[in-house]
């Protein structure tokens, strides 16, 4: 690590790519200590036998299957030797407990799962005698299966479904999962038609090849769109702008026309009830028309103010396309991030399951053994939950810092032939050596906002239908405010990472510097975040629409099943996810380029010794703006371009 003994300069000057020093080392140490705590939770759950109980399974008497057990004092049938009984078998696998998320059935350790359906207790007896696998409670011998009066309650529910062991988890699971499907039907209120879910699942299974092909199509379309945006960004932005203006004007005009038409045709001779309804409708149309007019006027004023700044959005999108040409590995960044998140989530769920089987044995209300954590250690669940949010945000922040570092390297390298062989890997190297503490701090700030919001959402869901209107309104307002704060902090964090990548300053310094730059360029930020984000959103909709249309055409000719709604929904959701991943990277690149451009125009003016770093396309934008400054009536843009002189700021 390059972090040892590094110091932070008190005086801060923007010095792209010249110096790198370690940032926020205390936060890195805190994050490492937190991860050690996460490891302790995992080690504790394994040391207390939770891992073996989860993987190998245990019966209702606390015995772990597949091994010799020690006696648990005070519990009957504990301490049995199950070396030859490697599988957990549930007497009634369909008896599900939704609240506690488990099967409410007696569990036994057996040597073999029933490979065929067993219709009667005589079949169960014959299976035990033939295969040596006793499917009834340990207190019964196979000879008692058909004679003992306790057999109906201590033997599996008939008919015993055909089962197969779950790989790696040693549980006997019914091959036909109809009981789970029916339970899901009740859960999602499909009780009115018990065959709906079966037909939906059948549609997914029959169309799996088509689903995979359409998912691949969405991937290809996303990559094609990223190339297209570079070359037609100018046309696309103006088309979107014109459509928005025409749509708002047209909608406002239609509302006023409807109001005038309804007012003209209002019949005062109608019955009182109908007359009141007509007057209410007329009043509503008037309110809608006035609101639409105000919205349209504000929108047109914003378009008028920002019309020349739209050119900057177009130029940035053009340069972003060039960035992807020079840094092709950027395209694969979402995959690496998703892979890292997936690995962590799998680990987190596994430890969560370990914790679910950790602790000391106790007797539940049915008289069987369960394991619970008592004392202060029971709060490990909360620690584990905070770890889920913080580490997930840390991984996402690492992606943002990696992209920012690579794009900053591209922007501030005058000769693109001097770029590192792999700027992405160079950025990852800088991240690991210098800036992990900054990333950890930024992720923690998001976590601090996200956890209270999640708690309030949980309280709101638990009190649904019980709280009064005032409390409900306050809860929703708090949740909304925290959500807005989270989004604002996430945007500021992203720009802080860019400032750190440029200047190697700590998180707070970088966030303050980035905020100053953003405030000085507020109108430009508004133009990029409205026009640019809206264009990318339409790109996502375009990919989903094309994929969905292709899916409809393909599925319409598939006659092997009757319902293809669920396959189409799956395809469209995957298409939106893929498009979001790709175009979000595009959006990040544009945001990083904008901050670099704002810094470039603030501290350089093109004179000797203060040459611009920017791309030719952005240079043309600056030159066009300078020419506009010299024209009569260009005072607004003149104020915007004054910061190009050294020491001034951008409007």
From Swiss-Prot:
Glycans are attached at residues 131, 176. It catalyses: choline(out) + n H(+)(in) = choline(in) + n H(+)(out); ethanolamine(out) + n H(+)(in) = ethanolamine(in) + n H(+)(out). The chain crosses the membrane at residues 26-46, 209-229, 235-255, 285-305, 312-332, 335-355, 377-397, 439-459, 534-554, 563-583. Residues 629-651 are annotated as: Disordered. Keywords: Antiport, Cell membrane, Glycoprotein, Lipoprotein, Membrane, Mitochondrion, Mitochondrion outer membrane, Myristate, Phosphoprotein, Transmembrane, Transmembrane helix, Transport. It is a multi-pass membrane protein. GO terms for molecular function: antiporter activity; choline transmembrane transporter activity; ethanolamine transmembrane transporter activity; transmembrane transporter activity. Residues 1-25, 230-234, 306-311, 356-376, 460-533, 584-651 are cytoplasmic. GO terms for biological process: choline transport; ethanolamine transport; transmembrane transport. Its main location: membrane. It is found in: Cell membrane; Mitochondrion outer membrane. Residues 47-208, 256-284, 333-334, 398-438, 555-562 are extracellular. Belongs to the CTL (choline transporter-like) family. Choline/H+ antiporter. Also acts as a high-affinity ethanolamine/H+ antiporter, regulating the supply of extracellular ethanolamine (Etn) for the CDP-Etn pathway, redistribute intracellular Etn and balance the CDP-Cho and CDP-Etn arms of the Kennedy pathway. Involved in membrane synthesis and myelin production. This is Choline transporter-like protein 1. It comes from Xenopus laevis (African clawed frog). The lineage of its organism: Eukaryota, Metazoa, Chordata, Craniata, Vertebrata.
């Amino acid at each position: 690590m390059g972090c040892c003994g590094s110091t932070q300069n008190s005086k801060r000057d923007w010095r792209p790519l010249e110096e790198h020093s370690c940032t926020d080392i205390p936060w890195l140490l805190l994050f490492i200590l937190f991860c050690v705590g996460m490891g302790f939770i995992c080690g504790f759950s394994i040391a207390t036998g939770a891992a073996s109980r989860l993987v190998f399974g245990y019966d209702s008497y606390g015995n772990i299957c597949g091994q010799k057990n020690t006696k648990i004092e005070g519990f009957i049938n504990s301490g049995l030797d199950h070396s030859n009984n490697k599988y957990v078998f549930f007497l009634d696998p369909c008896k599900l407990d939704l609240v506690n998320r488990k099967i409410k059935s007696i569990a036994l350790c057996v040597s073999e799962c029933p490979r065929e359906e067993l219709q009667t207790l005589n079949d169960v007896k014959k299976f035990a005698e033939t295969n040596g696998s006793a499917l009834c409670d340990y207190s019964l011998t196979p000879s008692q299966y058909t004679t003992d009066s306790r057999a109906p309650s201590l033997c599996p529910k008939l008919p015993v479904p055909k089962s197969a062991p779950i790989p790696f988890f040693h549980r006997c699971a019914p091959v036909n999962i109809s009981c789970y499907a029916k339970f899901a039907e009740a859960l999602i209120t499909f009780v009115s038609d018990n065959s709906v879910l079966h037909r939906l699942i059948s549609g997914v299974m029959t169309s799996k090849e088509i689903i995979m092909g359409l998912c691949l199509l969405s991937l290809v379309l996303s990559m094609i769109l990223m190339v297209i945006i570079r070359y037609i960004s100018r046309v696309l932005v103006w088309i979107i702008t014109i459509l928005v203006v025409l749509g708002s004007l047209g909608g406002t005009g239609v509302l006023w026309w409807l109001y005038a038409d309804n007012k003209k045709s209002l019949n005062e001779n109608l019955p009182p009830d109908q007359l009141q309804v007509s007057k209410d409708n007329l009043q509503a149309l008037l309110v809608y028309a006035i609101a639409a007019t105000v919205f349209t006027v504000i929108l047109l004023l914003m378009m008028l103010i920002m019309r020349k700044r739209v050119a900057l959005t177009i130029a940035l999108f053009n340069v972003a396309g060039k960035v992807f040409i020079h840094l092709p590995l950027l395209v694969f960044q979402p995959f690496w991030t998703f892979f890292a998140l997936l690995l962590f989530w799998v680990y987190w769920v596994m430890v969560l399951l370990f914790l679910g089987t950790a602790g000391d044995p106790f007797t539940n209300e049915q008289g069987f053994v369960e394991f619970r954590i008592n004392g202060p250690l029971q709060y490990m669940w909360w620690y584990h939950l905070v770890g889920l949010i913080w580490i997930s945000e840390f991984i996402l922040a690492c992606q943002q810092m990696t992209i920012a570092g690579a794009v900053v390297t591209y922007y501030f390298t005058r000769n693109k032939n001097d770029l590192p062989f792999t700027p992405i890997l160079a950025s990852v190297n800088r991240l690991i050596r210098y800036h992990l503490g900054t990333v950890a701090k930024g992720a923690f700030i998001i976590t601090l906002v996200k956890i209270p919001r999640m708690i309030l959402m949980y309280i709101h869901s638990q009190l649904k239908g019980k709280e009064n209107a005032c409390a409900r309104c306050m809860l929703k307002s708090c949740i909304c405010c925290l959500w807005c704060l989270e989004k604002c902090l996430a945007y500021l964090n992203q720009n802080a990472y860019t400032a750190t990548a440029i200047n190697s300053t700590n998180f707070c310094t970088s966030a303050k510097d980035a905020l100053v730059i953003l405030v000085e360029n507020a109108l430009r930020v508004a133009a990029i975040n409205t026009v640019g984000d809206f264009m990318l959103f339409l790109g996502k909709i375009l990919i989903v629409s094309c994929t969905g249309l292709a899916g409809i055409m393909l599925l319409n000719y598939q006659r092997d099943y009757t319902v293809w709604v669920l396959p189409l929904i799956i395809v469209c959701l995957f298409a939106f996810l893929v498009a979001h991943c790709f175009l979000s990277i595009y959006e990040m690149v544009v945001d990083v380029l904008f901050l670099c451009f704002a810094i470039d125009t603030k501290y350089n003016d093109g004179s000797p010794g203060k040459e611009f770093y920017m791309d030719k396309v952005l240079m043309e934008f600056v030159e066009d703006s300078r020419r506009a400054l010299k024209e009569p009536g260009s005072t607004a843009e003149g104020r915007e371009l004054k910061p190009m002189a050294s020491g001034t700021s951008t409007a």
